[in-house]
From Swiss-Prot:
This is UPF0340 protein BH3766. It comes from Halalkalibacterium halodurans (strain ATCC BAA-125 / DSM 18197 / FERM 7344 / JCM 9153 / C-125). Belongs to the UPF0340 family. InterPro entries: Antibiotic_NAT-like, DUF436.
Length: 188
C-alpha cells in the first residue's frame, strides 16, 4: 500500500507530465490534513500528515525549481504562505498574520515553519495547482484552468484535483493559435 507521501509523488509526476513546471512557474497547494486522515475538513489538523506531504512537495520543488504557495484555510481568507523573495519578485503584497493550526491549517503552518523567509500574501495567480481535500484553490489560479487527471484520485482519504493554466484564446474565426510559415516569412 502506498503512503500518502508516495501518493503525492505520483500525483506530482502526473501533473509534471501534463504541464512541465520549472523555476518560472508558481504552484498553489491547498490541503486539508483532516481529509487526508479521513476526517471532516477543519476538524483534525495533523502536523504529521503535513510533514509527509511537505517532504514530497519540497522534493518536487528541488527537482523542478517551481515556486510553492500554500493556501491557508478560510479563517485566514485562503491567504497563502510563500517565500518572501518569490512574493516580492511577483509583486504580491504581504499581509500581517502568521498561520497556526486552528487559523491557517496544519499544512500552511508547517510550510511557514519550513520556509527560509516566509510571508503571507492575500492572493496570487498561480500557473498550476493541486487541491487535496476539496479546499478550493481555483481563486488562486490564472485563467484559463485546464483540469489534469491523475492515475490516482485520492491522497489518503482526501479527494485530489489538479489544474494548470493556459493563456486565453482570443480573436475568433480568423485568429491563429500556432506559428505558421507566414510568420517565418516576416523574419528579417
Amino acid at each position: 500500500m502506498m503512503t500518502i507521501q508516495q501518493q503525492l509523488e505520483t500525483v506530482l509526476g502526473d501533473l509534471q507530465k501534463a504541464k512541465p513546471l520549472s523555476s518560472k512557474h508558481l504552484l498553489v497547494i491547498g490541503v486539508s490534513t483532516s481529509e487526508v486522515a479521513g476526517k471532516q475538513i477543519g476538524t483534525n489538523s495533523s502536523k504529521d500528515v503535513a510533514a509527509a506531504l511537505y517532504a514530497a512537495l519540497f522534493s518536487y520543488q528541488q527537482k523542478t525549481g517551481v515556486a510553492l504557495a500554500f493556501q491557508c484555510c478560510e479563517h485566514l481568507n485562503r491567504a497563502l504562505v510563500m517565500e518572501r523573495d518569490e512574493a516580492e519578485a511577483r509583486g504580491y503584497e504581504e499581509v500581517a498574520v502568521i498561520p497556526v493550526r486552528k487559523a491557517g491549517g496544519a499544512m500552511a503552518t508547517y510550510a511557514f515553519t519550513q520556509f527560509r523567509d516566509p510571508v503571507i500574501v492575500e492572493q496570487i495567480r498561480a500557473d498550476a495547482g493541486i487541491d487535496i481535500g476539496d479546499t478550493f484553490i481555483g481563486m488562486h489560479l490564472k485563467r484559463v484552468a485546464v483540469p489534469v487527471r491523475s492515475s490516482i484520485s485520492a491522497i489518503g482519504d482526501a479527494h485530489v484535483t489538479m489544474a494548470y493554466s493556459r493563456p486565453k484564446l482570443i480573436g475568433g474565426v480568423r485568429a491563429n493559435y500556432e506559428r505558421t510559415e507566414e510568420h517565418e516569412s516576416f523574419r528579417c
